[in-house]
């Protein structure tokens, strides 16, 4: 698999274009500020009078309403929540985007599942940093970059891949390395990772571990430290050098326990559940579920958010984190700024 770096990208391509970033959330604020700092002519497109409008203005960026900003753009990057993109594309982007312009996304969901059907005269690309927007921005400011994916869905100009690489470079991606994929692969693997491992799997594993200890009479504080707080220490070791690096760094007792108990907890039944999750993603069943959830104003998700917020692990966690001010000092998320 080829990895692209700074030397493989022509930054002048994106610097010669007017770029409109639709949205100023987690990814939007990072892309807009990074491209602006790289010398790209950037306009942020958001609803006038909203919090995002004020935040983008405060960051020194040019801000316009969506339809107006799209009309003058050579490249339009849509960085809105997946559920909001189809309507915004249909009502404000498609009628206004110039013929022969480039339409860009950071996730393939809507194109892959036909919620957005791009006009045939457009280049359609994806530039997807493999990290949250706050990290995309902080790594750029540090002089580095978050590894990114690029993909081409439509190549009307014959230069879509070069444009994607140039955009990725301006966003810092070619500092970390850029890998080419396609919309199908990015969408399906991204959803699977989120659902089975990173969010769904990890959250349920942590909560179940916490509940098992507290139900057996152990102090909630001890359960929090052992099942949530220390997870970062282990994940950082794996992130740094893989599973073998983590095992090299932990005690023999911890490593032996991993081999004895790990396969009992995450077992053949877990593998079958993962395969079922992947099948839902591949067939489009999950996409239909998510789209329908949005159409009914997210009743299931709202209920689950409330239950999670009320879980004892949240209560004890807040108290313990207050004892560790260095965590807040290094926080990735500042809700007042992004």
UniProtKB/Swiss-Prot annotation:
Molecular function terms, GO-annotated: ketol-acid reductoisomerase activity; magnesium ion binding; NADP binding
Binding positions for substrate per the UniProt entry: 251
Cofactor: Mg(2+)
Binding site for NADP(+): 24-27, 47, 52, 133
Domain of life from the UniProt record: Bacteria
Residues given in the record as Mg(2+) 2 binding sites: 190, 226, 230
Pfam families from the UniProt entry: KARI_C (PF01450), KARI_N (PF07991)
Transmembrane segments: none
Keyword Transmembrane helix: no
Keyword NADP: yes
Residue span(s) of domain KARI C-terminal knotted: 182-327
Name of the protein: Ketol-acid reductoisomerase (NADP(+))
Organism expressing this protein natively: Azoarcus sp. (strain BH72)
Gene it is expressed from: ilvC
């Amino acid at each position: 698999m080829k990895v692209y770096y700074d030397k493989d990208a022509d930054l002048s391509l994106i610097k010669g274009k007017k770029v409109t970033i639709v949205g100023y959330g987690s990814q939007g604020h990072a892309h807009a500020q990074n491209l602006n700092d790289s010398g790209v002519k950037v306009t942020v497109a958001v609803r006038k009078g909203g919090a995002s409008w004020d935040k983008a203005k405060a960051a020194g960026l040019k801000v316009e309403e969506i339809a107006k900003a799209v009309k003058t753009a050579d490249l339009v990057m849509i960085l809105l929540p997946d559920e909001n993109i189809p309507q915004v594309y249909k009502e404000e982007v498609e009628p206004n985007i110039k013929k022969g312009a480039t339409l860009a996304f950071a996730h393939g969901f809507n194109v892959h599942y036909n919620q957005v059907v791009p006009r045939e005269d457009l280049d359609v690309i994806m530039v997807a940093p493999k990290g949250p927007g706050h990290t995309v921005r902080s790594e750029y400011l540090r002089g580095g970059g978050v590894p990114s994916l690029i993909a081409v869905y439509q190549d009307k100009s014959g230069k879509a891949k070069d444009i994607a690489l140039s955009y990725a470079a301006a966003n810092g991606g070619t500092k970390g390395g850029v890998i080419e994929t396609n919309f199908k692969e990015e969408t399906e693997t991204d959803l699977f990772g989120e659902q089975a491992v990173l969010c769904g799997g990890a959250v349920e594993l942590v909560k179940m571990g916490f509940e098992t200890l507290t139900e057996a009479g152990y102090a909630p504080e001890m359960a929090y430290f052992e099942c949530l707080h220390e997870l970062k220490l282990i994940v950082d070791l794996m992130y740094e050098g893989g599973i073998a690096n983590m095992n090299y760094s932990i005690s023999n007792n911890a490593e032996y326990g991993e081999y004895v108990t790990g396969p009992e907890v995450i077992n053949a039944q877990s593998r079958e559940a993962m395969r079922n999750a992947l099948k839902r993603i591949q067939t489009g069943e999950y996409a239909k579920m998510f789209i329908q959830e949005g159409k009914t104003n997210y009743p299931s998700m709202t209920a689950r958010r409330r239950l999670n917020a009320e879980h004892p692990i949240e209560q004890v966690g807040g108290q313990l984190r207050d004892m560790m001010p260095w965590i807040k000092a290094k926080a990735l998320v500042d809700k007042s700024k992004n």
